[in-house]
């Protein structure tokens, strides 16, 4: 709430939410006055408002790890980049973020500082349709999973994989994807018919 209040004043004095990302110039003013007793009370009509970073391979990923936040780790979008994204979200009155999740980028929670930056900015983190329980299976199952990513035939290991992340994020604001499908955009393994998939 405090951030939204301060950023509302920022908007009123002419600072664009895009001031950093789009190099939007800030109009200089000699003074700015609010009427005595000024009050504004605003409520969002939608509780969670945000963006999903998708198809990050051609723009955000190379810009982040090669230019804005140089890293020896190819595809890493780190906390410095996310801080800029989160500031923009707050300036746009948003509060939710679905991070990049393709093979060209390092999974959000595998980059030190990303979780803490989201917590600092009060941003809810969600995951895409193929990332149940905050796990980027595309990137993380290879290193943190055991056996095949197959809930039907490897249930205990899949549950353990999810449980580790849920415990890690217990104190953070998250939106959990509960459905299951295969790695990335593949079909769910071990279930070949609609009845088996239920």
Residue ranges with predicted function:
Residues 148-153, 189, 193:
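Polar low-complexity intrinsically disordered regions enriched in Ser/Thr and small residues
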Residues 1-152, 170, 174:
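Feature activates predominantly on carbohydrate-active enzymes
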Residues 152-163:
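Glycine-rich anion/phosphate-binding loops
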Residues 159, 166-172:
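Residue patterns forming the tRNA-binding/recognition surfaces of aminoacyl-tRNA synthetases
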Residues 172-198:
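Active-site neighborhood of glycoside hydrolase catalytic domains
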Residues 85, 114, 161, 165, ...:
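A general structural detector for well-ordered alpha-helical segments in enzyme core domains, enriched
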């Amino acid at each position: 709430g405090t951030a939204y209040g301060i950023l509302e004043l920022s908007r009123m004095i002419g600072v664009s939410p895009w001031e950093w990302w789009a190099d939007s110039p800030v109009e200089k003013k000699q003074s700015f006055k609010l009427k005595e007793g000024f009050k504004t009370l605003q409520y969002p009509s939608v509780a969670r408002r945000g963006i999903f970073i998708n198809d990050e391979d051609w723009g955000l990923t190379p810009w982040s790890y090669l230019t804005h936040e140089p890293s020896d780790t190819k595809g890493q979008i780190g906390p410095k980049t996310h801080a800029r994204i989160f500031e923009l979200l707050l300036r746009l009155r948003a509060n939710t973020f679905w991070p990049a999740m393709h093979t060209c980028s390092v999974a959000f929670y595998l980059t030190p500082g990303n979780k803490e930056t989201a917590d600092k900015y009060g941003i809810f983190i969600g995951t895409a349709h193929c990332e149940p329980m905050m796990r980027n299976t595309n990137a993380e199952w290879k290193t943190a999973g055991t056996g095949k990513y197959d809930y039907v035939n490897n249930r205990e290991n899949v549950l353990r994989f999810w449980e580790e992340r849920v415990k890690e994020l217990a104190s953070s604001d998250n939106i959990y994807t509960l459905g299951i499908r295969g790695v990335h955009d593949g079909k769910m393994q071990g279930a070949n018919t609609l009845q088996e998939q239920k």
